[in-house]
């Protein structure tokens, strides 16, 4: 009977993962190291209605996917990434939104001796509140301290652990004494599968503004190269026309050859003061009609005011 139950469970698991792969066009491959059952339950509850979390043995997941390759060959891209303690998060929602929800469900964790540090750990300068008898402990870790009012004070920030280092017993003890929980554990996105394409989760950080700026940077680079080698393209032609016009204008200024636009430049170079004097005159000419138009309006307003006073029976000498 137990064998039948096990076989039935396996069959149901295969059907479930195949159904999820068919129903959901997008999923994350997530690492679940150091994630406990209680935290996993909280993650499932927070994603309810938006995503489905599926964990299982790697061999079973690979077997289920291989058996479904005839119907969906794109799933073969998932196989190389199913290694270690991993699972799937299936969704139809925006991937960035689900990623943010997974990050929000990380929980702080204390450092344990022998664990691999997922991030860098720095102990800030502070008064530890520990007694002088612990001084030798800090000295063994190479941390500069002094005694201040009967307690140990760390004088400067200290990088205690680097990313990927194994946490030593002394480092773990120190962090626990200082009540520092340097790590946070949760489901870590390792790969993104989206409608048959698989890519790094860093792609989710690319915004429309990033794409726009990268595109403009590429256009500028293309225009620069084309200008240097004299090869006309859509990006470089406007600059080529402007540069050509500047050269023709410079040639016209230095020679007797002229054309309408060059005549204005020549006139300016011949007598710049004329253009300086013309600017205030032009401004005054523009302002005069406006003032003239405003004056009749004020007179009309005054006449209307006087007429209204007479109509109301409040003349000046009544």
Swiss-Prot record:
Superkingdom of the organism of origin: Eukaryota
Modification comment: Ubiquitinated at Lys-264 by RNF14 and RNF25 in response to ribosome collisions (ribosome stalling).
Region (Disordered) location: 298-318
Residue numbers bearing the Phosphotyrosine modification: 24
Location of cross-link Glycyl lysine isopeptide (Lys-Gly) (interchain with G-Cter in ubiquitin): 264
Gene3D superfamilies: 3.30.70.1730, 3.90.105.20
Crosslink (Glycyl lysine isopeptide (Lys-Gly) (interchain with G-Cter in SUMO2)) position: 298
Sequence positions bearing Phosphothreonine: 59
Phosphoserine: residues bearing it: 305, 308
Gene Ontology CC terms: cytoplasm; cytoplasmic ribonucleoprotein granule; cytosolic large ribosomal subunit; endoplasmic reticulum; nucleus; postsynaptic density; ribonucleoprotein complex
GO BP term (any one): ribosome biogenesis
Positions of crosslink type Glycyl lysine isopeptide (Lys-Gly) (interchain with G-Cter in SUMO1): 298
Biased composition (Acidic residues): 303-312
Keyword list, A-Z: Cytoplasm, Isopeptide bond, Nucleus, Phosphoprotein, Ribonucleoprotein, Ribosomal protein, Ubl conjugation
Keyword Ribonucleoprotein: yes
Function: Ribosomal protein P0 is the functional equivalent of E.coli protein L10.
Assembly information from the UniProt record: P0 forms a pentameric complex by interaction with dimers of P1 and P2. Identified in a IGF2BP1-dependent mRNP granule complex containing untranslated mRNAs. Interacts with APEX1. Interacts with FMR1.
Family under the similarity heading: Belongs to the universal ribosomal protein uL10 family.
Official protein name in the record: Large ribosomal subunit protein uL10
Organism encoding this protein: Sus scrofa
Name of the encoding gene: RPLP0
């Amino acid at each position: 009977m137990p064998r039948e139950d096990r076989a039935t469970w396996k069959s149901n698991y295969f059907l479930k993962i195949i159904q999820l792969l068919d129903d959901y066009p997008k999923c994350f491959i997530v690492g679940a190291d150091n994630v406990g059952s209680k935290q996993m339950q909280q993650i499932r509850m927070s994603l309810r209605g938006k995503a489905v979390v599926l964990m299982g043995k790697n061999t079973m997941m690979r077997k289920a996917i291989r058996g479904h390759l005839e119907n969906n060959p794109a799933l073969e891209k998932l196989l190389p990434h199913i290694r270690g303690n991993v699972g799937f998060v299936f969704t139809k929602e925006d991937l960035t939104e689900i990623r943010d929800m997974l990050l929000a469900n990380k929980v702080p964790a204390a450092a344990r001796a022998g664990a691999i540090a997922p991030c860098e750990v720095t102990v800030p300068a502070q008064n530890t509140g520990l007694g002088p008898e612990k001084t030798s402990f800090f000295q063994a870790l190479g941390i500069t301290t002094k005694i201040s009012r009967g307690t140990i004070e760390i004088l400067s920030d200290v990088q205690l652990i680097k990313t990927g280092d194994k946490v030593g017993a002394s480092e773990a003890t120190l962090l626990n004494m200082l009540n520092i929980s340097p790590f946070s554990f949760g489901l870590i996105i390792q790969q993104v599968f989206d409608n048959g394409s698989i890519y790094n989760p860093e792609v989710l950080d690319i915004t429309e503004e990033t794409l726009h700026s990268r595109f403009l940077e590429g256009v500028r680079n293309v225009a620069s190269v084309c200008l240097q080698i004299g090869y006309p393209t859509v990006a470089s032609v406007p600059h080529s026309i402007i540069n050509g016009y500047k050269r023709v204008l410079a040639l016209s200024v230095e020679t007797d050859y002229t054309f309408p636009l060059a005549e204005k430049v020549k006139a300016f170079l011949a007598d710049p003061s004329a253009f300086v004097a013309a600017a205030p005159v032009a401004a005054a000419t523009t302002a005069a009609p406006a003032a003239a138009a405003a004056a009749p309006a004020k007179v009309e307003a005054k006449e209307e005011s006087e007429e209204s006073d007479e109509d109301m029976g409040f003349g000046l000498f009544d």
